Regions:
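Active-site loop/oxyanion-hole signature of alpha/beta-hydrolase fold enzymes
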Residues: 119-159, 163
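Conserved hydrolase catalytic core segment
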Residues: 154-196
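Catalytic active-site module of serine/aspartate enzymes centered on a nucleophile-bearing elbow/loop
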Residues: 319-353
């Protein structure tokens, strides 16, 4: 997922109901889903409130650069992580291509106010080594379990974004005793229930990865299209400058210097297996049996990266799951509305006994 720091810092507003949405969430029901599902929408233009964007001069913002990087040996790899805050643990599963430093400081400020937050580099990303084991959902879940064991965390609230949400689901299924709750952002339960991305966007992603593997320069149009797909049409219409690409940026490596092309290819294959395997039943049925408090967040404009209908399918299959859909947000919803997402997450977690 592409994180456009300029757009999220200079142009930040959230829907008013996000700050108080759970005061009445039990009363807001969408009858197309389970009757015991809490469904909250923040879509009415009349409820919008402009909020001053966070800046790095705010002493409460969490700058991960200021937090010491630690490493532990887990199996065949060294895992890099940072841990901060105080309270019940939250472990963050990054989106594809992102390292631990990609999380927005405003989001981290909110959630670390009453939780211990664990951000880490997945296998082969950033400061974590790639190892020799096959790059699979199962192996990445095993890595995470080993990390929690190494830092003496017995149970955590699991939060996953995009590809990280797939890994969060896999981890929850394989290690349910280590999971207190599950939050999925821009997600799908995969397999037979998955609604695919548009074919032209699948081709764009594959072309970009293949060009990166072969050191072929990317065009400005390709990069702009990739960014626009992540942000969604509503955000781009409001902030057209958010898709501007400097002329000297011609490769994925320049955007993601901590991402080796081979790992990008492995992550792409992991994602494709999850999304493009109709013979696999997916995870929805298994998640529904685990009885874990579940929060699902999606943007109204997440159409290309992860069609938002996939979030609806998770909620339909997981009894009691909460659905939050944020207006004018795309797949990059955690970058576009970091404080709002943090408030949602904190409030959801406060309801868990």
């Amino acid at each position: 997922m592409y994180s456009n720091s300029k757009s999220r810092k200079n142009h930040l507003f959230i829907v008013l109901v996000l700050s108080s949405l759970l005061l009445s969430s039990a009363l807001i029901i969408n009858n197309s889903h389970h009757s015991d599902t809490n469904v909250v929408y923040g879509q009415k233009n009349t409820t919008q409130q402009h909020i001053n964007p966070p800046t790095n001069t705010n002493p409460n913002l969490i700058n991960l650069q200021d937090i010491p990087l630690e490493k532990v040996r887990v199996g065949d790899i060294d895992i890099a992580y940072k841990m901060f805050g105080k309270g019940d643990p939250i472990i963050l599963f990054n989106g594809a291509s992102d390292g631990l430093d990609a999380w927005d400081p405003a989001l981290l400020m909110v959630i670390s106010s009453n939780h211990t937050v664990i951000a880490f580099d997945q296998r082969g990303i950033g400061n974590s080594t790639v190892g020799s084991q096959p790059y699979t959902h199962q192996q990445l879940a095993n890595d995470t379990s080993g990390l929690l064991d190494a830092i003496n965390i017995s149970k955590a609230n699991v939060v996953g974004l995009s590809l990280g949400s797939y890994l969060a689901q896999q981890f929850t299924i394989m290690y349910p005793d280590k999971v207190n709750s599950l939050t999925l952002v821009g997600s799908s339960c995969g397999g037979k229930d998955h609604t695919p991305k548009p074919a032209e966007f699948i081709k764009l992603q594959s072309d970009i990865v293949n060009k990166s593997l072969n050191n072929v320069p990317l065009s400005t149009d390709e990069l702009r299209e990739l960014i626009a797909a992540s942000l969604g049409s509503g955000w781009v219409n409001l902030h057209p400058e958010s898709v501007d690409v400097p002329a000297n940026i011609t490769s994925l490596q320049q955007l993601k210097p901590g991402l080796p092309p081979e790992v990008a290819d492995s992550q792409n294959k992991v994602g494709k297996y999850w999304e493009d395997n109709p013979l696999w039943s997916g995870t929805c049925d298994e998640l529904g049996k685990l009885d874990k408090p579940t929060l699902v967040i999606t943007g109204t404009d997440d159409i290309k990266y992860q069609p938002y209908i996939n979030s609806f399918k998770i909620v339909e299959k997981v009894p009691g799951a909460w659905l939050i859909q944020i207006k004018n947000a795309g797949h990059a919803v955690m970058d576009q509305y970091p404080e709002g997402v943090g408030i949602i997450l904190n409030t959801f977690l406060s309801t868990i006994k």
